[in-house]
Amino acid sequence: MSFVVVIPARYASTRLPGKPLADIHGKPMVQHVVEKALQSGADRVIVATDDERVQQALAACAGQAGFEVCMTSKDHQSGTERLAEVCRHYGFAADTIVVNVQGDEPLIPPVIIRQVADNLAAATAPMATLSVPIQDAEEVFNPNAVKVVTDQEGYALYFSRASIPWDRDRFAASREQIGDHYQRHIGIYAYRAGFIQRYVDWAPSALEQIEALEQLRVLWYGEKIHVAQALEAPPVGVDTQADLDKVRALLAN
């Protein structure tokens, strides 16, 4: 089964400017992500950036390492819009499976990149993603941890920053203990290329704007998202300097 990995790498991060090029043991962060994507067995790996500094930093190793760099518009409002531009640029067939791997996930396990691609290939949905079990009560009530609930076949019913499902009887007694039915969404997606353009052509939905979760647009317009439990939980991504320091320490060991 063939698939393409696209890694959006936007330079102008608010909390960590120049994030794609942050040095992690002699390599820019985005290069670590590329290496994980190559290890997943992807047919092609493409870094989609809006800044020539990222392109120049990767140019020397791209050809030899076996990945590509695609310059994209600075005007995109989301990584999915950048992904759509890449699909148009390369003229991917509508049934091409494209996996969107965030450029700030230098420790992402290659096995889950492959997993989400395989899951989409086997699913009756235009989009697939992953989740991990929540075992900490604090995380259930943390709005930064996005929860997902699915039907019996693994298709998403809803994503929310709220505590879903609400365990009425348990929480009436205490919120310190949780059941085993909570799943945290992981921000890795596989799409069929033809669907990506449909997605960006849709107007943003009320729900996605309220929750600030763009995947809700897919459910709003009546399409399915397949969700499976990740074979391996990804370690911390990089949003802040503290996250970057943590990743450096983990890789040093």
Curated annotation (Swiss-Prot):
Location (main, coarse): cytoplasm
One example of a Gene Ontology biological process annotation: CMP-keto-3-deoxy-D-manno-octulosonic acid biosynthetic process
Compartment list: Cytoplasm
One annotated GO molecular function: 3-deoxy-manno-octulosonate cytidylyltransferase activity
Pfam families: CTP_transf_3 (PF02348)
Top-rank taxon: Bacteria
UniProt keywords, alphabetically: Cytoplasm, Lipopolysaccharide biosynthesis, Nucleotidyltransferase, Transferase
Functional pathway: Nucleotide-sugar biosynthesis; CMP-3-deoxy-D-manno-octulosonate biosynthesis; CMP-3-deoxy-D-manno-octulosonate from 3-deoxy-D-manno-octulosonate and CTP: step 1/1; Bacterial outer membrane biogenesis; lipopolysaccharide biosynthesis
Gene3D superfamilies per UniProt: Spore Coat Polysaccharide Biosynthesis Protein SpsA, Chain A
Reactions performed catalytically: 3-deoxy-alpha-D-manno-oct-2-ulosonate + CTP = CMP-3-deoxy-beta-D-manno-octulosonate + diphosphate
Keyword Nucleotidyltransferase found: yes
A GO cellular component entry from the record: cytosol
Keyword Methyltransferase: no
EC number assigned by the record: 2.7.7.38
Entry function: Activates KDO (a required 8-carbon sugar) for incorporation into bacterial lipopolysaccharide in Gram-negative bacteria.
Family: Belongs to the KdsB family.
Name of the featured protein: 3-deoxy-manno-octulosonate cytidylyltransferase
Species assigned in the record: Aeromonas hydrophila subsp. hydrophila (strain ATCC 7966 / DSM 30187 / BCRC 13018 / CCUG 14551 / JCM 1027 / KCTC 2358 / NCIMB 9240 / NCTC 8049)
Taxonomic placement: Bacteria, Pseudomonadati, Pseudomonadota, Gammaproteobacteria, Aeromonadales
